[in-house]
Amino acid sequence: MNYTPNLLAQGLRTSRTYTIGLTVPGIDNPFFATLASTVIENLKLAGYHTLLADSLENQKDFESSLQMFRSRSVDGIIAVPVGNPSEITDAITGSIPTVLIDRYYENTNLPYICTDNYVGGYMATEYLIGRGYRNILSIQGVEDSTPSMERVRGFKDAIAAHSDKKIEYAIVGDAFSVENGYDQVKRIFSEGEAFDSVFAYSSTILLGAIRAFRELGIKVPEQVGIISFDNNGFLDFLDPAITRIEQPLSEIGRLASQALIDVIENKPQDIPPVQRLIAPTLIVRDS
C-alpha cells in the first residue's frame, strides 16, 4: 500500500513538527555541502525533514537563521555557528534543542560533534616535516573559528616538537575560500619568499593555491609540496592527486543527528550534553 504519514496529524498528537533547522556558512563550499548532505540523509532516515539556511559566514545572517527556525517551530537545530561566542551563545541556547557541528564554543554546555582539528593540524605538519620540508606556509581559514584556531595550535605544537630542525613558517589568510588561497600564494611567492611547502586549511583554499602556482610556473610537488584539509573526492582527480587530512563527515552527520533526536525524544535532561571530537585521517597521495 502507498501509505504517506500525515505529519500534521502526528504533530498535533505529539507537539512536534518533525522538522529540523540546519544552518551552514556557505552551501556553495563543497565541504559544507557534503556535511549538510550527510546530516539531511541521517535526519531523513529518522523520520525528520530538514529546513536548510545559509548564514554566508555572517553573524547577523546566522542569528536570522535561528529566528527563522523558531518562527517555523522546528523541533531542533543543527548549526555551524558563526560569530562572537559572547554575543550569540544566548541566541543558540534557547528552548529549542541544538547541536553544533564543525565549530564549537568552549566553556559552554552546548552539545557539539566536530573534527579534532588540533590532531589534524599536528598530523599535517608532522607529515610535511617527515618529508623533509623546512619552510612551511600555513594558509588558514576564518581566523576566529575553532577549526582554524585548533589547526594553528596543532601546527605550532608539531613545529615546536621538532625545534632541533629549525623549521621556518608563516601563518596567513582569513577565509575558507578559493580567493584566499590564490591571493596568498600569488602575493607571497611573487615576492620571492622561499617556502618549500604549503598547508591549506580547506580544499577551497587549496584550489586557489594550485591556480596561483600554475600561473607562476611553480610545479607541485617538484618545487613545492602541498597538504590540504578536507575529504572532497575531486582531490584525487587533480594532477597531482592531493595528500590530505580527511574529516569524518559521515560520522559527524550521523552522531549529530542522533544526539539531537535523543534530546527531542525525551532523553533524561540530567545527562551531560554530548561534546565529542573525532580524529581525522591522513590520506597520502602525490602532492
Q: Which sequence ranges carry the predicted segments?
A:
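Alpha-helical recognition/docking segments in bacterial nutrient-uptake
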Residues: 7, 15-126, 130, 189-190, ...
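N-terminal helix-turn-helix DNA-binding module of bacterial transcription factors
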Residues: 1-18, 153, 285
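Flexible loop/turn connectors
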Residues: 166-167, 186-187, 191-287
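Alpha-helical structural signal in soluble globular domains
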Residues: 38-42, 91, 150-162, 187, ...
